[in-house]
C-alpha cells in the first residue's frame, strides 16, 4: 500500500530531513521500497527532478537552501519516485504564496494528466479545491456530509454545512456561482 499511495505534506520544510541533500531525499523511498541498482536509482531521481521542473543543480543542496516552492517540488518528486497510483496532498499548497501556489497547482494538473494519478487533495481553500478537484467531499466533525462533482457541489450545495462553508468564503462570488 505504501508504494501505491504516497503523501505530500503541508510544510515541506518540516517534512524534509535538513541533513540530507535533495538527491538523498528523493532517492530514500527507492532505498526503502524498491531495491534497484545505483545507476537506475540515480536515473529515477534525475527523471523526477526534471518532471517537477527543478534543475539538476539543486541535487547537492539541503532543504534550507531552497525556496518554499522548490522544497514543495522536492517533496512531490520524492512522493512520485515510487510511481504511485494515488497522491495524498495534505494542504500541499497552503503554506505557499499565491504565485508559487499557482505554479504548483499547474504542475499537479500536468502530473495528473501525464501520469494518470489520482489525488486525494485535502484543503480548506475552496478556490484551490475547485481548481484541482473533479469531485469534492465536504466533511463536518469527521463525517462526510456531502460529496459530488465539483461544479455541481459549488453551484447547488445540498447540505447546510456545505452552504455555510461556501457562504463563509471571502469574495465568494468567485467560488459559488
Mark where each language-model region is.
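Hydrophobic anchor residue at the start of the ABC signature
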Residues: 76
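Conserved ABC ATPase "signature" region
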Residues: 40-57, 166-167
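ABC ATPase "signature
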Residues: 147-148
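A short, surface-exposed alpha-helical micro-motif characterized by mixed small hydrophobic
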Residues: 129-131
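Conserved ABC ATPase signature
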Residues: 62-66, 70
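Conserved catalytic motifs of ABC-family nucleotide-binding domains
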Residues: 83
Amino acid at each position: 500500500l505504501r508504494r501505491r499511495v504516497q503523501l505530500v505534506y503541508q510544510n515541506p520544510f518540516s517534512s524534509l530531513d535538513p541533513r540530507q541533500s535533495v538527491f538523498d531525499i528523493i532517492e530514500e523511498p527507492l532505498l526503502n521500497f524498491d531495491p534497484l541498482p545505483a545507476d537506475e536509482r540515480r536515473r529515477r531521481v534525475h527523471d523526477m527532478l526534471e518532471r517537477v521542473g527543478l534543475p539538476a543543480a539543486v541535487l547537492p543542496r539541503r532543504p534550507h537552501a531552497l525556496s518554499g516552492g522548490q522544497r514543495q517540488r522536492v517533496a512531490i518528486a520524492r512522493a512520485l519516485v515510487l510511481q504511485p497510483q494515488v497522491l495524498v496532498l495534505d494542504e500541499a499548497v497552503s503554506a505557499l504564496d499565491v504565485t508559487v501556489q499557482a505554479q504548483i497547482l499547474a504542475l499537479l494538473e500536468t502530473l495528473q494528466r501525464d501520469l494518470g494519478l489520482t489525488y486525494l487533495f485535502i484543503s480548506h481553500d475552496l478556490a484551490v479545491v475547485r481548481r484541482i478537484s473533479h469531485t469534492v467531499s465536504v466533511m463536518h466533525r469527521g463525517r462526510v456530509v456531502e460529496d459530488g462533482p465539483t461544479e455541481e457541489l459549488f453551484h447547488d450545495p445540498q447540505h447546510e454545512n456545505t452552504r455555510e462553508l461556501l457562504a463563509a468564503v471571502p469574495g465568494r462570488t468567485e467560488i459559488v456561482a
